Amino acid sequence: IRGGSSLTASNDPLIVIDGVVMSSGSVEGLSNPLSSVNPTDIESFTVLKDASATAIYGSRASNGVIIITTKKGKTGSVKINYSGNVSVSTRKNKIDVMTGDEYRDFIINNPNATEAMITAVNLYPGVNTDWQDEVMRTAVSTEHNISAYGSVKDYLPYRVSFGYTNQNGILKTSNFERYTGSVSLTPKFFDDHLNMNLNAKGIYIKNQFADTGAVVGAVSFDPTKPVKNDNNKFGGYFTWTTDNDPNG
């Protein structure tokens, strides 16, 4: 927020959620505390980046502070809200490379091609594999959020919410899945002279990271080879072995 202030230490801002200070290591397996918050649960989002940040939180706020306040219950009858969306992601461009037939003709007509190279490209006649299409996809993602809020008589406002996010990446097998749940109670006692805030949040995140090296491999891999062949060594998938066996 305030610009990098250290060459070796973290330059991440301090994140405060409902008065609780969160750091990148405060939740095991969660690199960014912001991903633990359902966006539909956020009431306000405040950024502090001047001297007031360090005055309140000390040296921990040297990189600025992000203060998040989540929604609370309101007095009145029960109200239920639902929101959802579906999004579609696709690659913007495709790198133009040779087809299997073009590459096969290029090798056959190359005076410097060896007999082994010509044999390799003719191993699967007519095969034209577009490896970019094999590793990329049009990704469909969904998000659903439902919440209920109200109060028990006038002294116990409450809010309960549940959210589900399933985000697919354009690289096959990449996926982000998140379940969030929260309960907020804000009871009032002694004619509103005593107010309490009770918050409980739960989150389950499942990340599946795809091998980004597959993008480079898809551009450079031999288009004359099929995705699958009759070799069961590698689950039926074609692959070059360490001895460069063109039979995979």
What are these regions, as identified by a protein language model?
Residues R2-G4, N85, N199-I205:
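Short loop/turn motifs enriched for small/polar and acidic residues
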Residues L7-A9, P13, M22-S31, G64, ...:
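Residues embedded in well-ordered regular secondary structure
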Residues V37-A53, T142-A210:
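Surface-exposed extracellular loop regions of Gram-negative outer-membrane beta-barrel proteins
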Residues I203-G236, W240:
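Outer-membrane beta-barrel translocator/channel fold
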Residues V37, R60, K74, N175-E177, ...:
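Short acidic-hydrophobic sequence patches enriched in Asp/Glu that either
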Residues I1-D18, S44, T54-K74:
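Extracytoplasmic beta-strand/coil segments of soluble accessory domains associated
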Residues D18-K49:
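Short acidic/polar hinge/loop motifs at secondary-structure boundaries
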Residues E102-I108, S184-T186, A200, V219-T224:
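Short alpha-helical linear motifs
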